[in-house]
Every structure is written in C-alpha cells, then in structure tokens.
Amino acid sequence: MISLRLLKRNTFSLFKILKCQTMAKSSFEYVKKFEADDSLLPNTWIVVRLDGKCFHKFSEEHDFSKPNDIRALRLMNYAAFTVLREFNDVLLAFGQSDEYSFVFKKSTTLYKRRAAKLLTTINSKFSSSYVFYWKKFFDEEPLKYPPTFDGRVVLYPSDENLIDYMKWRQADVHINNLYNTTFWTLVLQGNLTPQQAEKRLCGTVSADKNEILFQEFKINYNSEPEIFKRGTLLIRKSVFNKNLDKNSNIIVDTHDDMLKDRFWKDHSSLLLNRSKEILMYDGPVTDIVAEQINLIKE
C-alpha cells in the first residue's frame, strides 16, 4: 500500500510540473500568432518550380559540356525522381536545363497545403539528392561546391491552366535549346567569339537558326536528342511484371511532346481526381525504369 503521505507528495510534485508547463505555455506561446497562415487554396493545382541560382557560373566551374551536358541533365532527372519516389502526392514533374516543376495532385492535403512547407521540403529533397548522387553521374569529377536552387509556388485553378503551364515550359525548352545549340555551334565549330555569335543571332527566328545549323554545319536540328529538345517528364505509370504476373507501378522518365493535344487526350485520366484508370508504359527501359524493375524483382 502506498502511504497517504507519499501519495500527497507525488500529487503535489505533479501539480507543480503541470503548473510550470502551463505558465510557460501561456507566457511564450503568443509568438505563434506572428506566423502567417500560408495555406493554399483548396481545389487548385499546386506547382512548385525550382531554378538553379547562378548556374551559368556553376556549369563553368564544373566544366559542363556545351550546349548540353547529358550527365547534368540525368542528375537533375534523378534528383527529381527521388522527390516523386518519396512524395506520392506529387503527380508529375517536368524538367529542363537547371529547372524542375513539380505538380501536386489537386486534392492533396500534404502539410495542410502550407506553401512554405511544400516549397522547402521539395527544394531540400531535390537539392540534397543533387549533391548526394553527384558521383553517380559525374564519376571522379569532384563537386567543388554545392549548388543553390531557388523556388516558388504557383496555383492554377483549372486543368486548362495547368496544361498551358506545362506547354509553356516545354515550348521554353525548344526556344532555349535551339538558340544555345546554334550559339555554341558557331563558337565551337565556327570559331566565332561568344560576342560575335551573339551578334550573328541577334534578330533571327527559328527558321534562321535551323538554316545556319544545316547549311553551314550540316546539323539537322530535328535529329538532336529528344531530351535536349523537349526536356524530361516524370510520370507514374504501370508496367507488366512477368515474375509477379501483374502490373507494377513505377515512375518513368519520358520526352513526350506535351505541346500536342494528342498527349493530353492519351493522358486525360491523369488530371481526374481519384481516377482508377491505369496508364500503361511501353517505352524504353531507361536507367530510372530499370532501377525500379530490378527492385521489384528482388
């Protein structure tokens, strides 16, 4: 039997602890009132877009190939892949050069849709993965200093707005890559200085740049790799697993043409809330796809 005196002593001690905690809470917790409510509007598409900060300098310091370094692009894609792998609420992602956009499911309630939480979590996961997996793509080429990515959160109220956003980002790939391909061809093969190449391209349109590439350097821009011309789309699809005799869900990296309405017709279920339609993948087995298939086999 616990003595009455001991019981009173323990009760009094517990009362003092609870009283101190209550006083501390009431004394200091008022500072939480200064926190802004950044919950994003419901029933809207949330897009987090990350951009490399001072990446021109970063690419020069690390001797990236011009106009495109396939190692750097594959690293960007893999870093984005780790984001989708960890966060199921990210529906798809699209990247090019030093930029990546992450589209959340319209119905997501992740982190109560708080903008700061979503942005910082996606950015930190992506940035840390870029550093962590550097050696996977650059072998013995050392990472001289960690890169910096800034980010923003944008809301799109309708499916049409989101589709136009995706088309805008892919159109940007074409515009930038055609210019950069022509610019660096003039510098590296045409022996022009960067200033001379810039002056040569001033006022030119797409047809002019294609003409320069083909007539002067026998380069057919249409034959350039799709990853350079279209960027990379990461999307969730299914593949048939012969070992398990069923479909397995994976994240695939593709270079589909999102500027064409055909893509959105073929993927119409993608934007439907809680759609049960399965998007099957029959494309090439990329490194990202192969890695997931091998894990399924194990």
Where do the language-model regions lie?
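Regulatory and interdomain segments flanking nucleotide-handling catalytic cores
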Residues: L6-L7, F12-E298
